[in-house]
Amino acid sequence: MSYKSGFVSVIGRPNVGKSTLINNLIGQKVVITSPRPQTTRNSVRGIYTRPEGQIVFVDTPGIHKARNKLDNYMLEKAYESLEDIDVIIFMVDGNYSFGKGDEFIYNQIKGVRVPVIVAMNKIDRINKEIVMERQKNYEERTGFPVIPISASRGTNLDTLVEEIFTFLPEGPQYYPEDMVTDQIEQFVVAELIREKVFILTREEVPYGVAVKIEEMKERDNSTMYIRANIYAEKKSHKKIIIGHKGKMIKKIGRLAREEIEKLLQTKVYLDLWVKIEKDWREKEGLVKRMGYKG
């Protein structure tokens, strides 16, 4: 039996479940998630391997209207992910019929020369009759095959994977079978910290936050020491992140440390600092300094 492999770009509107899908397929958290849209800022690769083949998933920032330099960067990364790939997963929210946001993305991909599969997510929230109705609606509007799934519950993910493999070419194993992401540890650690800020803070605060790992080294007692700066755009945001008597930053640190220890399989001392970098999302130089490089 021939070995198949290829690169699969997962695109869609913000908060349709792209990161949840990849994490569930890989069986490990390689992409951060939160209930808020636009959590993902970089294109992240998740690697799915089985004896007969390998799929390299590329999770992308949600496609939306750009409002600042950071948004421009995120959209650039989303569109870059469509280059040199073998299959596109166009992810949509099954709670809704085909809408303007979906149409905008459809217009970007309808002319591509690679197979497109529509993954209609969140079917666990709607009854079977509506699932069938929405599936037909998306098939008629796009002309692509539509697979109803629940990324969070794992429903029909095996069907989606089989459909992807039918379109993949014969190819090499790009990554070792025990590798689940190509991202360096520092990137993943910074993202896990940022995820906790996203989940625990409110309103516009998380969108103006960046996390930069300043130091990461193993100590003599086999503990990993990590010093990270959390950058906020405003003094008021810094206060919210720190919280009353430091309660919020302690909670962010505790929850992030628990996940980082799972990732690194070692005890972690997480040293978090909150700093102000005014309007960094508006300045290209600062966007790059925060690690979002083109």
From Swiss-Prot:
Gene Ontology MF terms: GTP binding; GTPase activity; ribosomal small subunit binding; small ribosomal subunit rRNA binding
Organism: Halothermothrix orenii (strain H 168 / OCM 544 / DSM 9562)
Similarity field: Belongs to the TRAFAC class TrmE-Era-EngA-EngB-Septin-like GTPase superfamily. Era GTPase family.
Cellular location(s): Cytoplasm; Cell inner membrane
Record domain KH type-2: where: 201-278
Keyword rRNA-binding: yes
Residue ranges, annotated region (G2): 38-42
Membrane topology: Peripheral membrane protein
Pfam families the record matches: KH_2 (PF07650), MMR_HSR1 (PF01926)
Database matches in HAMAP family: GTPase_Era (MF_00367)
Keywords per UniProt: Cell inner membrane, Cell membrane, Cytoplasm, GTP-binding, Membrane, Nucleotide-binding, Ribosome biogenesis, RNA-binding, rRNA-binding
Protein's UniProt name: GTPase Era
